[in-house]
């Protein structure tokens, strides 16, 4: 099953008040594991970048002005994600920005199935902090390379968090006679009522370690 981890960075909080995308990143998963394929671009917002955004992301107007505008990258972005389910932390935020940008260039809004890991975390750990940082600390995922918020590094971290939220690799993942998952498509919506699987209690296999190493190598190219 192909899924896409997706994250964005923006100039602010509200695209309806003129805030724009400044970075988009996507990481491909197959059966919940990174394949090493990813899409990443910085985006010229065609406006100033507020100081607060620069402090969070490290991205400045001067840096972004030499990068493509959204209309120039939209087709490549859509071609990468295709109709695959999107895995996003706080999905409403990223989808709001993407859909406003797409609408402004006369393209249809995204209709992909969505998995919101914020929803998953709040359901699995009610009352506990559910930010990406908090979940990384909970699952002992290394945050040492995350000095600023960046869409690509956040996708890498979210891919590890998502695997843990699902209970670990292939835990309870059964194939039916037709070769498709018996878990069904309902799990791919925010309204899913299925119980999440318990946390994994075993170490990474050698195959997982190899795949993760290949993924990190691809990100650093």
Where does each model-flagged region fall?
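Glycine-rich, pocket-lining loop/helix-strand segments that form or immediately flank
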Residues: 130
